[in-house]
Each structure stands twice: as structure tokens, then as C-alpha cells.
Regions:
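Carboxylate/His-rich catalytic cores and anion/metal-binding grooves
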Residues: 1
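Alpha-helix initiation and N-capping motif
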Residues: 7-11, 69, 85-88
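Acidic/His metal-coordination segments adjacent to aromatic residues that form catalytic metal sites
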Residues: 7-32, 48-49, 97-112
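Alpha-helical scaffold segments that form or flank carboxylate-/histidine-based iron centers
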Residues: 23-27, 52-66, 91-93
């Protein structure tokens, strides 16, 4: 029996979010990054769904997930505007690191290791796949505009 526990990258993102004592980082991490991952995953699955019931069900799930993201954006937009530049940069760096981990989460390195494959070769192959590139595009089309809207796509982050 094969089981795939939570991957290292997703575990790392969740640990980073849940262990930080600042409530707003939990909001940024969960409402924007993790929910953004969920939206992208459901959207890519919906685009491939051939069963009309699954297609419709995924549409409802996407709508619900989008409400979660919107709630986070609306709540954080006002709060972030009250932060100092240093605090904004700190939160922007947190979001940036979570996005990098999100990208790594797409790669099944645990599975590659399990099957004894060359991890870097399999990783590069997977990064080049149309499906992964499409998923990344969906993910970052959802996450980046929201980070910009709440004021966390800072110049220091862009020049990073």
C-alpha cells in the first residue's frame, strides 16, 4: 500500500504560516497563498474534467474558495495600509518566500525519491511540462494581483 503524506514543501509552508505569532501572516499565508493554491488546483482540474457533474461541482468549489480569498484581500488591504514600510517589507518577504515554497510544492520530489529517480532530472522534466507551467500561471495570476492590491508587492521585493 502506497501513501503520499503531505509533501515537504507544503508542510514547510504550513509550518511557516502556523508557527508565526502574527495573525496577519496567518491571513496572508492561508487566505492568499494556500487558498490561491487551492483555486489553481481546482481550476486546472476543472479544465481537464470531462464529467459534467465533476465540472459543475468544481465550479461551485472554485466560487467558494474565491470568496475565502476575497475576504482575506478585503480585510488585509486596510490593515496593511496602517503598517510601517519595514513591517510591509517583512510581510512582503514572507509572502514571497511562501510563493517560492508553493512553486516547489508542485514538484513531487518525495515521489521521485520513493521510486529511486534522479530528483533533479525529474524535477526539471516536471517543471518543463505544459500542465505544471499552466498550473503555475494560474497560481500566480491569482496570488500576485492580490499581493499587489493589499500593498505587498513592494519595490524591494520586485528587485529581489
Amino acid at each position: 500500500k502506497m501513501m503520499y503524506p503531505i509533501g515537504n514543501a507544503l508542510k514547510s509552508i504550513l509550518d511557516k504560516i502556523l508557527t508565526d505569532p502574527r495573525w496577519d501572516l496567518k491571513f496572508i499565508g492561508m487566505q492568499l497563498i494556500i487558498e490561491g493554491l487551492a483555486l489553481a488546483a481546482f481550476q486546472s482540474t476543472r479544465e481537464l474534467a470531462k464529467d459534467p457533474v465533476l465540472y459543475d461541482m468544481l465550479g461551485l468549489i472554485i466560487r467558494d474558495e474565491a470568496r475565502h480569498v476575497t475576504f482575506g484581500v478585503n480585510y488585509l488591504e486596510e490593515f496593511v495600509s496602517t503598517l510601517s514600510e519595514e513591517e510591509k517589507n517583512d510581510r512582503a518577504q514572507f509572502a514571497y518566500e511562501a510563493c517560492l515554497l508553493s512553486r516547489e510544492r508542485l514538484l513531487s520530489t518525495d515521489v521521485f525519491e520513493y521510486f529511486g529517480w534522479d530528483v533533479e532530472e525529474a524535477r526539471q522534466f516536471q517543471l518543463g511540462s505544459d500542465l505544471i507551467q499552466h498550473f503555475q500561471k494560474l497560481l500566480f495570476q491569482r496570488v500576485m494581483p492580490n499581493l499587489a492590491r493589499i500593498g505587498l508587492l513592494t519595490l524591494s521585493l520586485i528587485h529581489n
